[in-house]
Structures are given as structure tokens and as C-alpha cells.
């Protein structure tokens, strides 16, 4: 009976330890994941601007590339093309699980211009589109790749009204 109790206690201790995994990345992991995120976002911008998802290879999983391809097809069906430029991003949080999975929550800042796909005419521009995004990454053969991207929120900053001072004599 005592032997079974010891085995049970050891098993429970192992389960608790596994459930309390430290998800804080090491400095090297943080740098590697941030580099992968940056490279993916630049490739994503190029994919949107050129309507070519091949630039995502090596940065994203086949499923993620297929998801981007679907979005690009939807743009073409609405006769739109997007020219996207990544202005910057800031990592809000990062967690590493079992040394091979990462979750990164970030704020992305984009300069986005929408064009007619056929006539090339500008339909609209937002030079500072903000997106709160969640990226899922996986370490594959020593390289972090994006396996999923979820846009949590979008924000279009509203320009502040400019106050015009009255001219003298008014």
C-alpha cells in the first residue's frame, strides 16, 4: 500500500511539474522568434503587394500560406489589390511551450493603399493602420515558422482636427 502511495505521489508531482512549465523565452529564443515574426511580416507585405504567396515559403506553414492565398483571391474577386508596407511592430507578449511552440501577441503598424486590380487607380489609403495580432509559431528543423495568424482587432487612427487661428481683424 505504501509503495502505491509513493508511486501515486510521484506521478502527481510529475503532472503538476508538467503543468507548471515556464513559458518565458530565453533571450536567444526571444531574438529568434522576433526575427521570424519580422521576416514573416515583411514576406506577408510582399505577398499582398504582388499577389504572390511563394514569398511566404520558409516563413509560414503550408496551411498559413493557403489561408493567405484565400484572402488574396477574395481581394481579386472584389477587383482590389493592396499595397502593404510594414511600418513596424511591437511585441506585447511572447510565450514558448515545450521549446518548439511559440505564441506572440503584437501590435502591427501598416501603411496600406488599396488599388483597383484592373485599372491600378488608388481607391484609398491608410498610412497608419494598427492591428492587434496573435501569431502561432512552431520550430521546424531549427527554424521558427508561422503556423497561424489571428487578427484580434483593427484600429484606424482618426486624425485630430487642425485648429485654424483666426486672422487679425476677424
Model-identified regions with their sequence ranges:
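Bacterial N-terminal signal peptides
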Residues: 7-17
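Bacterial N-terminal signal peptides that target proteins for export
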Residues: 1-7
